[in-house]
């Protein structure tokens, strides 16, 4: 017991020295977490030996020491990866490398220089909440640390990694808890941003200049902007929409980057008739065998995770699949899950197998194989 007490005293003495030093060096904070880890190992062992006190020190239950030890291991190993990155020489405070800060939204990221954002629900100053907008956020993507800036808009607080936008505070979700009218205003940096009556999560329609089919378009910003992806609500739409007047536009799903414009109703109706005939003929041929359908992989998971994963697929593995849909959801379903879906299509089953053999699908995303009984291409 005396040996255990000496080791514990030495460990706690080193912790006190680190606290007093209040260093800005990352190596010192790594040393701090090593000491915390060692301290909890000693306390865990003391409890196993049946000790309730070591001198004046109360020995906590096994579960407490085990949990704190695991936290210390996690922080030590994570900070060691930061030290090896280009940000290892930056000044870091003890608070910025604390476990509490590690779990502060956005979770499992390091944050610096927080600023307060006030959100007034129902546009009432007495019904307001305060959130922290971080000037710098350190995100680990594919085992590589990236330093990005925190940003705010009417929808929430977010950061961008490449072209992938991640919201860590969603004002619409918060409004469902704190607001009666689902309206709010954001007060930040001497500016006030008012919300619409309802915030739509879909991408705005594409605006067309002129009646021709290849006019210049202006695209609204999407949560994850990938040039070959369709808008969020277009996946389950039929090949053409029936329009009610001239100079309207319909999207053509066969190629998501193209726009089809109809200058009169007759032109579009005739195209619909031809397309429907081809669709029925294709269905009759495909019903004979599943293998004649288009091979697909259907990904299911959190909407934002799917968008980020889809962005990486286009960036690194676009040769291993043919098309990727936007994120979509089943409607009129008794299933209350909020998981989104992304559908990938392939030239043949061999390309799909090559994709599965090469690409590591995250554990948070479920995938199923299948065939489409209608022609998308």
From Swiss-Prot:
Q: Which stretches of sequence are listed as region DNA-binding domain?
A: 293-377
GO terms (molecular function) for this protein are: DNA binding; DNA-binding transcription factor activity; nucleotide binding
The yes or no answer to whether the keyword Transmembrane is present is: no
Q: Which Pfam family is one of this chain's hits?
A: PPV_E2_N
Q: Name one GO biological process term.
A: DNA-templated transcription
Segments carrying the region annotation (Transactivation domain) are: 1-200
InterPro entries recorded? E2/EBNA1_C_sf, Nucleotide-bd_a/b_plait_sf, Papillomavirus_E2_C, PPV_E2_N, Reg_prot_E2, Regulatory_protein_E2_N, Regulatory_protein_E2_N_1, Regulatory_protein_E2_N_2
Question: Which terms are listed as keywords in the entry?
Answer: Activator, DNA replication, DNA-binding, Early protein, Host nucleus, Phosphoprotein, Repressor, Transcription, Transcription regulation
Using the UniProt annotation, give all residue ranges assigned to the region (Disordered).
270-297
A GO cellular component annotation in the UniProt record: host cell nucleus
Spell out the Low complexity composition-biased ranges.
272-292
Lineage, top-rank taxon, reads: Viruses
| Modification comment | Phosphorylated.
Q: Where in the cell is it found?
A: Host nucleus
* NAD as UniProt keyword: no
The entry sums up its family as follows: Belongs to the papillomaviridae E2 protein family.
Its quaternary organisation is: Binds DNA as homodimer. Interacts with protein E1; this interaction greatly increases E1 DNA-binding activity. Interacts with protein L1; this interaction enhances E2-dependent replication and transcription activation. Interacts with protein L2; this interaction inhibits E2 transcriptional activity but not DNA replication function E2. Interacts with protein E7; this interaction inhibits E7 oncogenic activity. Interacts with host TAF1; this interaction modulates E2-dependent transcriptional regulation. Interacts with host BRD4; this interaction mediates E2 transcriptional activation function.
Job description of the protein: Plays a role in the initiation of viral DNA replication. A dimer of E2 interacts with a dimer of E1 in order to improve specificity of E1 DNA binding activity. Once the complex recognizes and binds DNA at specific sites, the E2 dimer is removed from DNA. E2 also regulates viral transcription through binding to the E2RE response element (5'-ACCNNNNNNGGT-3') present in multiple copies in the regulatory regions of the viral genome. Activates or represses transcription depending on E2RE's position with regards to proximal promoter elements including the TATA-box.
What is the name listed in the Swiss-Prot or TrEMBL entry for this protein? Answer: Regulatory protein E2
Q: What is the lineage of its organism?
A: Viruses, Monodnaviria, Shotokuvirae, Cossaviricota, Papovaviricetes
């Amino acid at each position: 017991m005396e040996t255990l007490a000496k080791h514990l005293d030495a460990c706690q003495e080193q912790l006190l020295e680190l606290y007093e030093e209040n260093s800005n060096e990352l190596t010192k904070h790594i040393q701090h977490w090593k000491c915390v880890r060692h301290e909890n190992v000693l306390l865990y062992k003391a409890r196993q030996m049946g000790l309730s006190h070591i001198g004046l020190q109360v020995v906590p239950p096994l579960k407490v020491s085990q949990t704190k030890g695991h936290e210390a291991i996690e922080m030590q190993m994570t900070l060691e990866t930061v030290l090896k990155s280009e940000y290892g020489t930056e000044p870091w405070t003890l608070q910025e490398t604390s476990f509490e800060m590690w779990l502060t939204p956005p979770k499992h990221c390091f944050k610096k220089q927080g600023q307060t954002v006030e959100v007034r629900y129902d546009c009432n100053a007495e019904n307001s909440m305060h959130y922290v907008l971080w000037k710098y956020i350190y995100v680990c993507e594919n085992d590589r640390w990236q330093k990005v800036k925190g940003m705010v808009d009417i929808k929430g607080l977010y950061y961008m990694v490449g072209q992938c936008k991640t919201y860590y505070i969603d004002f619409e979700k918060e409004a469902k808890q704190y607001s009666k009218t689902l309206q709010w205003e954001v007060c930040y940096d001497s500016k006030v941003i008012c919300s619409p009556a309802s915030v739509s999560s879909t991408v705005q329609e594409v605006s067309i200049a002129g009646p021709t089919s290849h006019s210049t378009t202006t695209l609204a910003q999407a949560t994850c902007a990938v040039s070959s992806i369709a808008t969020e609500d277009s996946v389950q739409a039929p090949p053409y929409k029936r329009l009610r007047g001239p100079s309207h536009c319909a999207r053509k799903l066969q190629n998501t980057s193209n726009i089809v414009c109809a200058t009169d109703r007759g032109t579009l109706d005739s195209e619909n008739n031809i397309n429907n005939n081809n669709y029925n003929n294709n269905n009759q041929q495909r019903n004979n065998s599943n293998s004649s359908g288009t091979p697909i992989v259907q990904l299911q998971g959190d909407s934002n995770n799917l968008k980020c994963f889809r962005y990486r697929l286009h960036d690194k593995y676009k040769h291993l699949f043919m098309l990727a849909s936007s994120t979509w959801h089943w409607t009129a379903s008794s299933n209350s899950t909020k998981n989104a879906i992304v559908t990938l299509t392939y030239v043949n089953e061999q390309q799909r197998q090559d994709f599965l053999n090469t690409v590591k699908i995250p554990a948070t995303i479920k995938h199923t194989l299948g065939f489409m009984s209608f022609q998308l291409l």
